[in-house]
Amino acid sequence: MATATLTIDLDAIAANWRALDQMTASDCQTGAVVKADSYGLGAAKVAHALARAGARRFFVATCEEGADVRRALGSGPQICVFSGHMEGDTALIRDFDLTPMLNSIDQLTRHFEALGGQPFGLQLDSGMNRLGLEPGEWEAVAGFALEAGPELLMSHLACSDDPDHPMNAEQLGAFRAMTDGTGVPRSLSATGGILLGPAWHFELTRPGIGLYGGRPFEEARPVVRLSLPVIQVREVEIGEPVGYSNTWTAEHTSTIATVAAGYADGLPRTLSSRATLYAGRVPCPLVGRVSMDLITVDVSHLPEVPETLDILGPHQTPDDLADTAGTIGYEILTSLGRRYQRRYGALAA
């Protein structure tokens, strides 16, 4: 079979959620971010696993994502939408019982006119300058917005992956200035904010990348293994090139495995002649270009060529691969291609 297998450990995702939940006080709820199809790992199955672990509030990017999660979970859990109430979203918000995080005066107006009485939250800009009501706007509308009974006041940290960055304290101060005394539950922290400490926790946290084994949650359990099938093996003589543009040439007689995955499957082209794959615990260098469907790997040092080679797993996390590619683990996870056969179960040692 020429299809790679992406193994996803739902028990590990649930364990990571529980570990992050235990970092906060008992009166602080821990939500779960399942946007972008749970970072590419399958929102329906991931949301089910997190609900079984105890999560009761889920966050998505769009109403369409929210509808998919609601179909998977049924009634009960709250599903919050970061993009708020966009034009054309009214029917989805109503029909799938979604809670938009309203982020502008226009959205406030749209929501109150179209769905007065429907739950909502408010997103405030504490300094990231991306989404949310700015302090001046909030001051102007806080009275009637609070009177309408928001479920949540939230903001987002720009630099929480760097605990020493002064922006963390600046945003904390700005958020408190806008929300102290409102009596409304508040949320400022994703994974990085949880790790900053209790001052950033408020009444709700909403971890994302930490659930899926990523930084900055260094104690997270690994969640994915990506095993790529070897299609063909050939001997390459000294001086012979491999792959497009002849970017790699054999300096000695080499055994080269052609492996079924490429940039169409989410492997960045910047991994060319830089990445490492694994045969069990043994590293094997990627040689030559990453092409659309194929990569080539030097397996000269293996006593026997295996049927598959791992590019993600216990010996190489998405963050490790991202470091090699010059990107971030989020991009590696969310780019994992549709051609992979997804299998849910424990990761083999």
From Swiss-Prot:
Substrate binds at residues 130, 292. Coiled coil: none annotated. GO terms for biological process: D-alanine biosynthetic process. It holds the Pfam family Ala_racemase_C. It comes from the Bacteria. Its EC number is 5.1.1.1. The modification N6-(pyridoxal phosphate)lysine is found at residue 35. This is Alanine racemase. It comes from Cereibacter sphaeroides (strain ATCC 17029 / ATH 2.4.9).
